[in-house]
Amino acid sequence: MPSHQIALPALSRRALFRQSALLGGAAALTSLPFGRQLLAHDVSENWPTVAAMANRYVSERKLANLLLTFGWGQEDHAHTVGGGNLSLAKPGAVDENSLYRIYSMSKPITGMATMILIDEGKLGLDQPVAEILPAFRDMRVLVDPAGALEDTVPANGPITIRQLLTHTAGLGYQIVSKGPLQAAYNQQGLVGGRVSRMPIPGFPVVTPAPGLAAWADRLAELPLMYQPATKWSYSCSIDLLGRVIEVASGMEFEAFLKKRIFDPCGMTSTWMQVPQSEAHRLTDNIGVLGGNVFPLDPAGNSIFFDKPEVPAGGGGLVSSPKDYDRFLRMLLGYGRIDGKFVMSEEAVRVGTSNLLPATVDLTGSWLEGEGHGAGGRSTGATFGWGGAAGTLAAVDFDLNLRSCLWTQYMPSEAYPIRDEFIAAMEADLKVMRAKKKAA
């Protein structure tokens, strides 16, 4: 089935996860008195600025399905703030079990799946990818990233697993590349995520490659945008890791995620393909154009009910707030959840740290002055990433806090909700600190 793509926008500004820098020394918040008595309840009274922001977006009908979740430490349930409806067109409130297209919030999951295999010795962090996928040996690099595909030079070194985890391999992306390389990505079906069954004016209809193995082979035939380990450039590298995981583990990518992450984390509502039996939980994804909203991927006819040709580790998952909070809780527990290890403490510590090669130039990139771990931004204290439909998730190891913004709209820059969410969190946490100090 053709995949209708829209340009998935820049996921954040430099300030995406800046709360760790502004809230230094706030680890004592973990002992604030919201405890067990508030589990599974709305905690808007503790987050009034966040709640006001959420209520404004919902009441103005800018968004339907806005929900914010917070969890402290290893609390076994996320607290919620806000909550609209599954759709702008009909009633039915969202909750922690509602289903959202998480797009690039898939990347930290694939990153941690890779870290599991590194921890087990089946992959090496600085191992050349060509040792796993020989087609990636002897890569070529475009002289001009937007120039002719024939105008190339040899790569100065091999692509490594570290580079794939951190978008420093020099690979392109259908939503980032320009000129002939972007056209080649479209022609070869090198898509990283699905948007809608409906045609979208102004955007190409792309037929995906017939499977993850074919997708990887086709990618290897195209030149890189940049020399490996020289520049941070948002790319399809996390999607390629799905194929690396298959070969290294001997399992299909989706099966590996289920066995090694979803099942042990207790994530029962995270899929590449939403079962029809769960259709009643799926939110609408809306488009925003000129201040007007329209159904982009309505839940009743969602493309996510179809089995994807290519399981996209960089942008293909649907999940629930409850499920993703359990993933964040596992990270915050350094690999442990409900008394059991999903992955080792070392694998989490390494995967959430700054893994950028020392030779990479971040000038002018989204990450300038910050770091990147296994599929997500790393600031030292925080780790996380966002999704193309407005979602945002992070763990803060200093605060012992897990937080997530849930909504569904495209393009994500249509509203400044991410920046507003972070600013609102900062304001409420400042009040919490003051109250604790006064007490």
Residue positions per predicted region:
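Glycine-rich phosphate/pyrophosphate-binding beta-alpha loops
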Residues: V310-G316, T382-A394, Q408-S412
